[in-house]
Amino acid sequence: MRRYHKMEKIGEGTYGVVYKAQNNHGEICALKKIRVEEEDEGIPSTAIREISLLKELHHPNIVWLRDVIHSEKCLTLVFEYLDQDLKKLLDACDGGLEPTTAKSFLYQILRGISYCHDHRILHRDLKPQNLLINREGVLKLADFGLARAFAIPVRSYTHEVVTLWYRAPDVLMGSKKYSTAVDIWSVGCIFAEMINGVPLFPGISEQDQLKRIFKILGTPSVDSWPQVVNLPAYNPDFSYYEKQSWSSIVPKLNESGIDLISRMLQLDPVQRISAKEALKHDYFKDLHRPPEFLNGVH
């Protein structure tokens, strides 16, 4: 760790403390120190293998993992540094983002996700806090792959409850078949939040989270979601709710935006649109794409 000089603590994430630091060449970076439970026997070798794979991810919309440093009791991930995240931006923008900004951010989120999904890596814990933004308006996804390496704890490093607001209904009901669709659900929730300025499903417990989802999307049935009855937490006596119209939920979205969000926020994961398909959606046809969007990875 002598190569890095800690400048300040910048956050406490799901897995540990994050510091702003400087390396010997004067470059600013972010150090994410992964805490290992005291009773654990050091860092699992599987985690180190998983994390090492993430160093191979190179994409303009993925936060670059520059280095991995591990000692017996601590794993430090060295990332490129970005000074803003989507949560801070949304907190500062009353009433949601400008439509063109929301569209640009959504496109970039989907590009990053599509790239990771192509590499068979899921995020599983997407939320505005781990979508980082630089001053040029480039958005990058942070913490990809960490859920598989370390499992998402119920409580974070600081003992805060890890948010359920962006978690898919299939996961909330105990599905262990994680697929790319879990990330698409999270993106749909973030899309609505960028437009409305407030979280779409701000639940306080798993039950409350499901109730909020069903109040908007309607209570699932075997007809609308055939596999729902096989989920561990499925309850045939869930309160019955009618599906609401998307135009009343996201009134500022145009017709193509409503079509896209409705394809993302499908209760049945099999019916959710893929990131690759979403990138081709009509909603983006008028998006001004900077050259790096068109050239792909650089």
From Swiss-Prot:
Its cofactor is Mg(2+). The keyword rRNA-binding does not apply. InterPro entries: CDK (IPR050108), Kinase-like_dom_sf (IPR011009), Prot_kinase_dom (IPR000719), Protein_kinase_ATP_BS (IPR017441), Ser/Thr_kinase_AS (IPR008271). GO terms for molecular function: ATP binding; cyclin-dependent protein serine/threonine kinase activity; metal ion binding; protein serine kinase activity; RNA polymerase II CTD heptapeptide repeat kinase activity. ATP binds at residues 10-18, 32. Transmembrane segments: none annotated. It catalyses: L-seryl-[protein] + ATP = O-phospho-L-seryl-[protein] + ADP + H(+); L-threonyl-[protein] + ATP = O-phospho-L-threonyl-[protein] + ADP + H(+); [DNA-directed RNA polymerase] + ATP = phospho-[DNA-directed RNA polymerase] + ADP + H(+). Gene3D superfamilies: Phosphorylase Kinase, domain 1, Transferase(Phosphotransferase) domain 1. Pfam families: Pkinase (PF00069). One of its GO terms (cellular component) is nucleus. Keywords: ATP-binding, Cell cycle, Cell division, Cytoplasm, Kinase, Magnesium, Metal-binding, Mitosis, Nucleotide-binding, Phosphoprotein, Serine/threonine-protein kinase, Transferase. GO terms for biological process: cell division. The modification Phosphothreonine is found at residues 14, 158. Its EC number is 2.7.11.22, 2.7.11.23. It is found in: Cytoplasm. The modification Phosphotyrosine is found at residue 15. Residues 4-284 form the Protein kinase domain. Phosphorylation at Thr-14 or Tyr-15 inactivates the enzyme, while phosphorylation at Thr-158 activates it. May form a complex composed of at least the catalytic subunit CRK2 and a cyclin. Belongs to the protein kinase superfamily. CMGC Ser/Thr protein kinase family. CDC2/CDKX subfamily. Serine/threonine-protein kinase. Involved in the control of the cell cycle. Required for entry into S-phase and mitosis. Probable component of the kinase complex that phosphorylates the repetitive C-terminus of RNA polymerase II. This is Cyclin-dependent kinase 2 homolog. It comes from Theileria parva (East coast fever infection agent).
